[in-house]
Swiss-Prot record:
It is found in: Magnetosome membrane. One of its GO terms (molecular function) is transmembrane transporter activity. It comes from Paramagnetospirillum magneticum (strain ATCC 700264 / AMB-1) (Magnetospirillum magneticum). InterPro entries: Fe3_Rdtase_TM_dom (IPR013130), MFS (IPR011701), MFS_dom (IPR020846), MFS_trans_sf (IPR036259), MsrQ-like (IPR022837). Residues 488-599 are annotated as: Ferric reductase-like domain. This is Magnetosome protein MamZ.
Amino acid sequence: MPRNAEAPAKGTTADDFAPTQWNIIYLLMTVGALMAALSISIQPLLLDKIFGIAFEKEGAVNADIQVVAEIVSIVCVGWFGLLSDRIGRVRIIALGFLIAVVGAAVSLLSLQVGLAFGAAGLVLFYLTRVLLTVGADTVQLQLSTLVGDVSSRANRPRLMGNLVFMMVFGGTMLAAIVMQMADYPGGVFLIMCLPLLAGIAGFQLTRRNLRDVAPPQPASEDDEHPLRQVWTVITSDPRMQLAFAAAFYTRADVIILSLFFSLWCISVSDLVGVTRTFATAHAAVMIGLLGLAVLAAVPLWRSFIERHSRISAIGASLSLAALGYIWLGMFANPFNWLVALPLLMVGIGHAGCFVTLQVLTVDASPKPILGAMVGAGYLVGGLGTVMLVQSGGYYFDALGPRAPFILMGTGKMLVTLYAAWLLANGIDETCDHHLKSARTVDWKPLVFLTAALPFVWLVGRSVIEGYISNGSLGEAPVGFVNRYLGDWAFTFLIISLAMRPVQEITGIKTLAKYRRMIGLFAFFYAVMHVLAYVALEWALNLGDMMGDIYKRPFILLGLVAFALLIPLAFTSANSQIKRIGGKRWKKLHSATYVINALVALHFILAANHENGEPYVYAAAVIVLLWYRFHQWRGGNVLRALRIG
């Protein structure tokens, strides 16, 4: 079992840090947040003016780039979190700055290729966004962990609040000021140069000024795997379950607003008679106002969480942000300065939730696995970002530019209801921030609600917008709805396929009871995907469908995969396992490997040349299938990777 979360490590008090080192930490956090914010804020303008992406594809392509960057970042940054417990935080921070420097250098190359060849430079831009996201997120995560190492329960809200303050200052206020250069000749080039210079400066400052304070935790064969320890902490503490559910929606706040508010301004710029560079600068100003709200609210929330329950703080901050998002979704014109009011609400809510999550995670984490716990929180937030940005991109193109904000608002309301349910059932903190009872909570309701949310939101939004009022979704939205449902089916297939390797790597056997639930959601979204194609796209016209399949043979691959998935779904119950027999059931369900391969090929052939997302999904399938094949041949992947 993990050691006590507050076991003191010698020489790790806040007083052991000189004021100069604290200033360096805050400065580096500002630099890391600035690099991340600039790469996101400039993206819509580059895709529109440099790479020539068509207006009707802007939402999906912007979302795809962010999704690819987040998927790669989840893997890399999560691994760095585990590694930092063994080799220290400072080395990983320096590595993060180096990765960002490489990404910034590639971005300048992609700019020149884009100017010369248009969309041909998009591949390099994908690489740029991946490297900058991995580098900047690594820096911010490890700096938070370093402050967690040196803080105590008494001063943690203040220190974490200061860190969040500087991160928001760099990611919103400072980024908003820098983005004003976009409206001037040569301004875009200067903006793209700044992450390169900032990364080099951050690397030098890290090497010369930072030092680790927590002793490295060398790996031992007798120790429980860190991920298993993380799971133990989360499952034994309902506050952490709430915190991770909130992180799913909170980390995406700035990304969603920076990306889709900028896209919204650009998409209507011609209608209101302004240039697209001016629209980008205007969006940056509004995001800067959001950042100002966060900065002003951090001290207030810091005081609140010192005196009140963290569960109450999460619920209150999430509900405020949710109302702000829903209000923002009701505006028709992003250039109406009244949109600042809901943005201020989102900013205040984001500040409370983010600070509370940081403090609660460090409070509940045993010191030896603090890096792994913070990394797990990043993993959940990254998965949320992937799912929300992916959905937001489709909604932006199919249902309008305000749709992503409604998505965020409804998701936050869902977690708010979960917080209210905990409080209503007597799960709360004492005055010194310890749980009043040792009651544990099953994850199944939360997993079910989260997995069902994309479909519920799609149906609800379609009804609100009137797409179903006349019995038809209309020609334009059908393609997006069909693709959206197919993406979710494939996403849940991959998650289901990945759960057994994760279970074997971590030793967390309880994951098995969620695997079939995830698999059934994959089948559900696959059914919706097929129905959308058959009923909405072709209105049950078999002749036209056959002609379409002849022209686009990849559809046949999808239908074969769906046919193979049907018996797996109908034999998933425990009663069917007993009826069929365990060995025959396992042999039948090994068809999931073929299904994933077929769907990956179907996805690649269906995608356009501007979309790199299918290749990332396919790479994930290849890695997982390689793992299963190696295990089937008698190899020990875990021992080969030195993680089992």
